[in-house]
Amino acid sequence: MVFYKYSGSGNDFLITQSFKKKDFSNLAKQVCHRHEGFGADGLVIVLPSKDYDYEWDFYNSDGSKAGMCGNASRCVGLFAYQHAIAPKEHVFLAGKREISICIEEPNIIESNLGNYKILDTIPNLRCKKFFTNNSVLENILTFYLIDTGVPHLVGFVKNKEWLNSLNTLELRALRHAFNANINIAFIENEETIFLQTYERGVEDFTLACGTGMAAVFIAARLFYNAPKKATLIPKSNESLELSLKNDGIFYKGIVRYIGMSVLGSVFENGCF
């Protein structure tokens, strides 16, 4: 089995093709392991589709499936073009969501994640039981639960330095309480937003999360008067340009091809 590794905004993914759907959870855990595998944040299985250029199954590094992953959508878009699966502009199916891809330059990829849904507005009082004394999160008056393909809890702090003082145990507790990824952000100015994301499936801070950046962007737009176009900067410091067009969330940034890996034992074990 051949895997192609791509990176988008600091997230890295292994991408391979299959001609039929099956459960690749164990394979994802094996190949995504940082020490005993090739190492990646997730595994993308590219599958044939009757109605789209292709479709995918996406697995987190712990083997759990996810309906959507923003940065992986840009990576698989470039992979599909480079492997003659799809043209520069194409549409693929991620779970039940149509994702459109536009390759503007050799490694600048724009992805349309589609629409979003505001699930809940959560006052600080509902979250205080998860905070330690003098927690940075105590300063967040309101959290926003937003679905951008997967659910995200978003909160904004007033000091950029507080992003470096977040407590992993608190974020993990929030992640399980709301069954969502956790995003803490700082709005530096009208068009620049910094953020940190604690991601489900990774179960830790991640260098970047595309759907998380989309959720932060939407919350900033709806509740903090951010413009329809902004630059978001995650932990990796690799910025993404997000924009809102006709209620669709578009985001654009660099995708890098890292290399190719071969796992011969998969054929022997009949996993493919």
Swiss-Prot record:
Task: Name the UniProt key words of this record, in alphabetical order.
Answer: Amino-acid biosynthesis, Cytoplasm, Isomerase, Lysine biosynthesis
Which EC number(s) does UniProt give?
5.1.1.7
Kindly list the places in or outside the cell where this protein is found, as annotated in its UniProt entry: Cytoplasm
Q: Which GO terms describe its biological process?
A: lysine biosynthetic process via diaminopimelate
- Which residues of this protein are annotated with the site description Could be important to modulate the pK values of the two catalytic cysteine residues? 152, 199
**Which Gene3D superfamilies does this UniProt record tie to the protein?**
Diaminopimelate Epimerase, Chain A, domain 1 (3.10.310.10)
What does the record give as the active site?
A: 69 (proton donor), 209 (proton acceptor)
Name its pathway: Amino-acid biosynthesis; L-lysine biosynthesis via DAP pathway; DL-2,6-diaminopimelate from LL-2,6-diaminopimelate: step 1/1
Entry keyword annotation includes Amino-acid biosynthesis: yes
Name a GO molecular-function annotation: diaminopimelate epimerase activity
- What are the disulphide bonds in this sequence? none
Q: Which residues form a coiled coil?
A: none
| Residues annotated as transmembrane | none
- Where the protein is mainly located, per its record? cytoplasm
Name the job this protein performs.
Catalyzes the stereoinversion of LL-2,6-diaminopimelate (L,L-DAP) to meso-diaminopimelate (meso-DAP), a precursor of L-lysine and an essential component of the bacterial peptidoglycan.
Record family assignment: Belongs to the diaminopimelate epimerase family.
Query: Partners and quaternary state?
Result: Homodimer.
State the name under which the record lists this protein. Answer: Diaminopimelate epimerase
